[in-house]
């Protein structure tokens, strides 16, 4: 369970999730393929390919006698992203001339009220220039804490009768006061260890800083952020690694696990994209 909690804590965004899955696969002896480079596959080997840094597909080719198909298939799929707030391109705005807030939009099927009155932070991916090349890097501004606040009960006496939140006007994360607030890109650059003017773009999300924990009198319950859908990503990874065993039950079976972005989406990393469409087993 400790490893699972660590995985959740280390994966505030889909980019971090794929990065951590990739590390685990490489440690297990898997080889990374590039979609743009022709490759040759060998039986008995394990491979994986990533797309956009947010989706990953891994597969194992069993050793079979020539002319024979695998005796079975182990196939699993999950999505690497979680419902959250995505920061818009013009991501910083001021309210009443003093409060610095994030300009965000809904991402995924969110339960809006669960984001109120709890410590939040920002993470994602940046693109920057290095020696004339475009480089991507994941970032986690975990030292920054922001918050989406409820109004005081005095200001809305009907609060406990049910409130419909407008995510565009009622749920902008507050990150500081204008007189004390450094530029967001400077915070990103300092965290990434690069020059601020080398950053060309960022893809950032708001995430909950709360940690996973066991609950209940016998610790039989589990709670934490991003369980949708990182619990399935972790389960799929562990199942895939277990399927690479050397026993008789595993040696002639193919295995495949898929971590995609925007489940059901038709974008280049979604469930209905060409990466999945052209995967045959």
Residue ranges and their predicted role:
Residues 1-281:
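N-terminal hydrophobic/helix-forming segments and targeting peptides
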């Amino acid at each position: 369970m400790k490893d699972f909690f660590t995985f959740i804590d280390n994966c505030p965004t889909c980019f971090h999730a794929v990065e951590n899955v990739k590390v685990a696969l490489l440690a297990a002896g898997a080889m990374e393929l590039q979609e743009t480079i022709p490759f040759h596959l060998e039986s008995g080997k394990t491979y994986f390919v990533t797309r956009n840094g947010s989706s990953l597909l891994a597969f194992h080719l069993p050793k079979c006698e020539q002319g024979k198909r695998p005796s079975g298939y182990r196939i699993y799929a999950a999505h690497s992203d979680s419902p959250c707030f995505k920061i818009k391109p013009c991501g910083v705005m001021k309210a009443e001339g003093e409060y610095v807030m994030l300009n965000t939009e809904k991402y995924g099927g969110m339960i809006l009220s669960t984001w109120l009155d709890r410590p939040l932070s920002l993470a994602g991916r940046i693109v920057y220039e290095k020696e004339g090349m475009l480089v991507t890097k994941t970032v986690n501004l975990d030292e920054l804490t922001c918050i989406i606040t409820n109004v005081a009960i005095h200001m809305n006496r009907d609060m406990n009768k049910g409130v419909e939140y407008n995510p565009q006007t009622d749920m902008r994360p507050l990150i500081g006061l204008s007189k004390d607030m450094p530029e967001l890109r400077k915070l990103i650059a300092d965290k990434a260890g690069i020059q601020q003017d080398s950053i060309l773009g960022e893809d950032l999300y708001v995430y909950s800083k709360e940690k996973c924990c066991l609950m209940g009198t016998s610790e039989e319950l589990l709670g934490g952020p991003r369980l949708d859908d990182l619990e399935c990503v972790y389960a799929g990874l562990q199942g895939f690694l277990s399927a690479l065993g050397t026993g008789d039950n595993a040696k002639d079976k193919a295995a495949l696990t898929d971590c995609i972005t925007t489940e059901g989406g038709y974008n280049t990393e979604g469930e209905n994209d060409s990466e999945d469409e052209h995967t045959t087993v």
